[in-house]
Amino acid sequence: MSLTMHPTKLMNDFFAAIEFMQRYPQAAGKVGITGFCYGGGVSNAAAVAYPELACTVPFYGRQAPTADVAKIEAPLLLHFAELDTRINEGWPAYEAALKANNKVYEAYIYPGVNHGFHNDSTPRYDKSAADLAWQRTLKWFDKYLS
């Protein structure tokens, strides 16, 4: 479905979900976001567009433009797959921008795994990396959303 939708409309749909959660009484006033692959890129974009997010956890997602990093206020927990050269090529510049702008972040590169290591419906699934990344994610959410 996402391949047939206009990218701006698709991103606006994700952003509408964030805005819904910001008004949702059970959200306790704090909203965080996570996403995988394309959704990881959405998570990074949301961190720029919604500085009021409580936290952001992208899994192997395209990084936001380095020029936009100053807008990020949410603490970031970033998960990368060592063998994912396409996504990882943007990481050094993104990390430099995060450091230069004194952003709160932690980043993990999981050794020997590829893009999609958390997706248990594909051959790229790596249970130990997925479990560790998910434990870290839940801890991050507990820290920033509780």
Q: Which residues are covered by each model-predicted region?
A:
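Acidic catalytic loop of the alpha/beta-hydrolase fold
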Residues: L83-N88, H115
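C-terminal catalytic histidine-bearing segment of alpha/beta-hydrolase fold enzymes
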Residues: K99-S146
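Short alpha-helix in the alpha/beta-hydrolase fold that links the catalytic acid
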Residues: N88-L98
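Gly/Ala-rich beta-loop-alpha elbow adjacent to hydrolase catalytic centers
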Residues: G35-G39, S43
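Short beta-strand/loop motif that positions the catalytic acidic residue
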Residues: I72, L77-F80
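A conserved short beta-strand
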Residues: E52-R62
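Gly/Ser-rich "nucleophile elbow"/oxyanion-hole loop immediately N-terminal to the catalytic nucleophile
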Residues: M1-T34, Y144-L145
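Active-site signature of alpha/beta-hydrolase-fold catalytic machinery across serine-
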Residues: A45-A49
